[in-house]
């Protein structure tokens, strides 16, 4: 592996790790769904002017906005409001096993005994670490984070089927579709958006 590739890998891991801390700080200032809606609004405003609309794929992008934008990120922001950032990061590691299982169920991809054993170890490991006594995390919020990872696994399969839409275009239009969904749910279920 080239040094530049290694550096990019370390930087992406660093930014992913700091994301959990940044979100934790954010949900202490704003209601979780409202904060996520604002985040998607900013993403849409910044990206939409620079990408074309995937016209023949709009319905698929909308479905991804429901599973990834609203379900995954919405549940993630609600969950992390009652869970330690470190525990959230550990639970998030189940995203890969969930994706493998959903790819097997919906895309008919196969995996062998070693991968099945790895999936089992991942689930047992997360249960063991996340359930460690002394954590200040709410079990309900842990379950909500787990549900967000489940939604991410479903979205990963949907995205894999959408090969002809690039990542930036998908992100822009998913944000545009997700923001109103989250504003609406926030208006119904949350309070204190503007204080």
Q: Language-model segments: which ranges?
A:
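Hydrophobic transmembrane alpha-helices of multi-pass small-molecule transport proteins
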Residues: 41, 47, 64, 101-106, ...
């Amino acid at each position: 592996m080239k040094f530049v590739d290694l550096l990019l890998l370390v930087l992406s891991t660093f930014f992913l790790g700091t994301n959990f801390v940044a979100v934790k700080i954010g949900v202490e200032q704003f209601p979780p769904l409202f904060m996520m809606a604002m985040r998607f609004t900013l993403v849409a405003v910044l990206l939409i002017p620079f990408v074309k609309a995937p016209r023949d794929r709009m319905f698929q992008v909308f479905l991804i906005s429901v599973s990834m934008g609203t379900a995954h990120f919405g549940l993630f922001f609600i969950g992390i409001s009652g869970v330690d950032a470190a525990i959230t990061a550990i639970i998030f590691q189940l995203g890969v096993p969930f994706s493998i299982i959903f790819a097997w169920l919906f895309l008919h991809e196969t995996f062998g005994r070693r991968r099945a054993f790895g999936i089992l170890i991942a689930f047992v490991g997360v249960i063991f670490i996340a359930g460690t006594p002394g954590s200040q995390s709410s079990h309900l919020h842990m379950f909500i984070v787990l549900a967000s990872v489940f939604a991410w696994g479903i979205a990963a399969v949907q995205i894999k089927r959408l090969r002809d839409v690039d990542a930036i275009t998908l992100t822009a239009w998913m944000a545009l579709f997700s923001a109103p969904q989250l504003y609406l749910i926030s208006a119904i279920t949350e309070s204190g958006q503007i204080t």
